[in-house]
Amino acid sequence: MNPALFQKFISDYTILKEVDFVPEISLYQASDITPIWQATENWLAEQNIEPPFWAFAWPEGKALARYIIDHPRFVKQKKVLDFAAGCGIAAIAAGKNNAQFIEVADIDPLAQQACASNAKVNHILLDKNSKNIVGLPCQWDLILCGDVCYETPMTRHIWPWLKKCAATGAQVIISWT
């Protein structure tokens, strides 16, 4: 992973703007879905990276963030994981509301960079920025998942782990439409 190259890519193809429905948070977001997909197709293939799901504040993440901002005690003094974080909006909301520990996890290195960049512009310090954590022992009080069960293979991969985390006492919240 080359953070400088990834940051340049994010800066070139997104703009920093407030999130609709959650104006307390600003994110680097694609201004239009088509240009980023077209402009990045070859580059992404060369880097072996997934499409730029991180470049959008998806409704599920916005719903989690809105809930956290409106109900700050939900995250206060908790160890929070934003799983399959994408842009990191849920983690940023947790940081703005006094979470004790904030970790983002995403297998896409561009998403990891986007989370770091988005946290920085929102004056949030991420405690950890992780890649593939599925299967690791649960270390969190609260696991936030924005629309991670949209494909059967992904769901089959993560569901047993999320259930195990819940069985050890973590609260697991999955938002999807």
Segments predicted by a language model, with ranges:
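N-terminal auxiliary segments of SAM/dcSAM-dependent transferases
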Residues: 1-36
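A short glycine/serine-rich beta->alpha loop
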Residues: 38, 46-55
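Conserved SAM-binding loop and adjacent beta-strand
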Residues: 51-69
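Conserved SAM/SAH-binding loop
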Residues: 129-135
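C-terminal substrate-binding/active-site "lid" region of AdoMet-derived donor-dependent transferases
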Residues: 155-177
